[in-house]
């Protein structure tokens, strides 16, 4: 019976892989739901599916997009997506939101805030999986990229949502990372999270609309000066600062031309493929870390002592390092 079940699973996975490759719009969400699942039997099927589709992936340009609060990220992503479709691309939009379980996610929001893109036959929008942990969301997003590329989408836009380490996670899974910011009076770096500027490959001052155009150009000059202090003169790529009005549709072509130029520069130096290989290795170790953490959380003895250990750490009776050591010993993850 077990062999028959395995054979049936193989048939199901083969059929799903064929359907995804063929661009079946109904098969794609089924495949994505499978890779998002944390059930052990689903994880096994998902890995078999990914193994079959991996040779068909890798041809898309993966672009991460983050932004300061109020920058109009959704409007910008939709405008860029529609612009790319007009240029003959097939565009997928993913969100990385580690808070999606706690907040209820943006399952309705993604499609209502990008209404035109959501209904276009050459676009696909997928809200963040409701994993509740950044590691879980990151894993599901990386695996979803493989499915989307195998399905023929040649541009994958990955949006960061919420706060925390989502920018770093997205930067580690894309080819080009774009930071959207606003023209601000005074210090132009105000509102940009510490460290995010160093992650960016391209910086865009959005909402350069009408009377704000001059202010946006001034902000772009100030940001360019700041970036020159971060990157040495001999750097392979120094992030350019562009101005854009997503509402008016200005600057979209320049943004995408810059994304393509970034890829050309990296490819010419042999860095594009090297970056992707490094990301695969990074992904491997992230999966190891996630698996070890899952093993610790699921250990029944750890669950029994967790509250008491946390209480003692809060009370100052136990250092975090000693508490961690006890947890690892209980979970049989030390060399003692």
Swiss-Prot record:
CDD domains: MMAA-like (cd03114). It is an enzyme of class 3 (hydrolase). GTP binds at residues 67-75, 209, 245-247. Its EC number is 3.6.-.-. InterPro entries: GTPase_ArgK (IPR005129), P-loop_NTPase (IPR027417). One of its GO terms (cellular component) is cytoplasm. GO terms for molecular function: ATP binding; GTP binding; GTPase activity. It comes from the Bacteria. Keywords: ATP-binding, Chaperone, GTP-binding, Hydrolase, Nucleotide-binding. Homodimer. Belongs to the SIMIBI class G3E GTPase family. ArgK/MeaB subfamily. Probable GTPase. May also bind and hydrolyze ATP. May function as chaperone. This is Probable GTPase Rv1496.
């Amino acid at each position: 019976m077990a062999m028959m079940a395995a054979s049936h699973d193989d048939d199901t996975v083969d059929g799903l892989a064929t359907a995804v490759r063929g661009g079946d719009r109904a098969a794609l969400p089924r495949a994505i739901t499978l890779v998002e699942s944390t059930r052990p039997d689903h994880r096994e099927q998902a890995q078999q599916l990914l193994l079959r589709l991996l040779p068909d992936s890798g041809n898309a340009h993966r672009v991460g997009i983050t932004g300061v609060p109020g920058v109009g990220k959704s409007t910008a992503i939709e405008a860029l997506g529609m612009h790319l479709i007009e240029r003959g691309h097939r565009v997928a939009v993913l969100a990385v939101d580690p808070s999606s379980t706690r907040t209820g996610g943006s399952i309705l929001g993604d499609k209502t805030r990008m209404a035109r893109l959501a209904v276009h036959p050459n676009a696909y929008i997928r809200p963040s999986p409701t994993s509740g942990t950044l590691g879980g969301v990151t894993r599901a997003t990386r695996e979803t990229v493989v499915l989307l590329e195998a399905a023929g989408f040649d541009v994958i836009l990955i949006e960061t949502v919420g706060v925390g380490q989502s920018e770093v996670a997205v930067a580690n899974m894309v080819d080009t990372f774009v930071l959207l910011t606003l023209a601000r009076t005074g210090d132009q770096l105000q509102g940009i999270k510490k460290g995010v500027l160093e992650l960016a490959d391209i910086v865009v001052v959005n909402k350069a609309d009408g009377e704000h155009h001059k202010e946006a150009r001034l902000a772009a000059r100030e940001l360019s000066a700041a970036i020159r202090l971060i990157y040495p003169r001999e750097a392979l790529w120094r992030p350019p600062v562009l101005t854009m009005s997503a509402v008016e549709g200005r600057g979209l072509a320049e943004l995408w031309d810059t994304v393509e130029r970034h890829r050309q520069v990296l490819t010419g130096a042999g860095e594009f493929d090297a970056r992707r290989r490094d990301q695969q290795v990074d992904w491997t170790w992230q999966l190891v870390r996630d698996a070890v953490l899952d093993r610790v959380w699921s250990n029944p003895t750890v669950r029994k002592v967790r509250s008491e250990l946390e209480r003692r750490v809060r009370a100052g009776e136990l250092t975090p390092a000693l508490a961690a050591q006890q947890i690892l010993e209980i979970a049989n993850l030390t060399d003692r």
